Amino acid sequence: MAYSIEVNEIADGWKKLVEKIMHDGREIRDERGSLTREVMNTVVTIKKPLGKSDDFYHIRRGSLLNIKVPEGYFWSGEKLEKYSEQFLSGDRKGFVYTYGNRLRAHFGVDQLDEAIRRLKNCTESRRATMVTWDPPEDTASDEVPCMILVDFKIRDGRLFTTALWRSHDIYGAWFPNAVGLAYLADHVAAEVGVEVGHITIHSISAHIYEVNFKEAEEVIKW
């Protein structure tokens, strides 16, 4: 059974997921032998992915994102901004893959531009979907994308974004991934001329690594 929640902001969703996994997660060892605690099929809908408050951390692009960062969290500032920008860049920057490269260059088609084109042509389109998984390459590799799919829908003048992760490091990666997704959604919404709506993140395997158990326990005490 899926664990589904609605939250106002990205940081709220991250904290609730950390709490859920530390309380109810089942211990699982992954392919590399790392011990994790895991909850299957978590679905988090973020109602205000761009944030609102003046004292939130600011990321400047074409517009201003006001996204709250968990206090003391290691993803913040310039590091978080640069990571978010990778969602829009087709350059792999020396990595085996990046999400931006898979979305914009890897398959020989710019899926992001095509999604925007479809939404401009038909605001009710159900075809503005992008994928990262490359079966011929990824079935033979140990370094494969965790985010598999991103989908955009325009409803009631707002852009609703849904993304699927096959595997999600909740303590170490969920928050920056969600910020990167918000960055991506903000770009698409601006190109199409609509407001950013809810973002929904479905994590098939939502887990926390043993190396982060202590930090995660501290989050629960907040």
Curated annotation (Swiss-Prot):
Q: Name one GO molecular function term.
A: thymidylate synthase activity
UniProt KW keywords: Cytoplasm, Methyltransferase, Nucleotide biosynthesis, Transferase
InterPro entries recorded for this chain? Thymidate_synth/dCMP_Mease, Thymidate_synth/dCMP_Mease_dom, Thymidate_synth/dCMP_Mease_sf, Thymidylate_synthase_arc
Which BP terms in the Gene Ontology apply to this protein? dTMP biosynthetic process; dTTP biosynthetic process; methylation
Q: What Gene3D superfamilies does the database record attribute to this sequence? A: Thymidylate synthase/dCMP hydroxymethylase domain
**EC number(s) given by UniProt:** 2.1.1.-
Source species, domain of life: Archaea
Q: Which residues form a coiled coil?
A: none
Q: Where in the cell is it found?
A: Cytoplasm
Q: Name one GO cellular component term.
A: cytosol
Q: In which pathway does it act?
A: Pyrimidine metabolism; dTTP biosynthesis
Q: Where is the active site?
A: 146
First-listed, main subcellular location of the protein, grouped into a coarse class: cytoplasm
Q: Which cysteines are joined by disulfide bonds?
A: none
Q: Which Pfam families match?
A: Thymidylat_synt (PF00303)
* Family indicated by similarity: Belongs to the thymidylate synthase family. Archaeal-type ThyA subfamily.
> What is the protein's known function?
May catalyze the biosynthesis of dTMP using an unknown cosubstrate.
Q: How does it assemble?
A: Monomer.
What is the protein name stated in its UniProt record? Putative thymidylate synthase
The record lists the organism as Methanothermobacter thermautotrophicus (strain ATCC 29096 / DSM 1053 / JCM 10044 / NBRC 100330 / Delta H)
Q: What is the lineage of its organism?
A: Archaea, Methanobacteriati, Methanobacteriota, Methanomada group, Methanobacteria
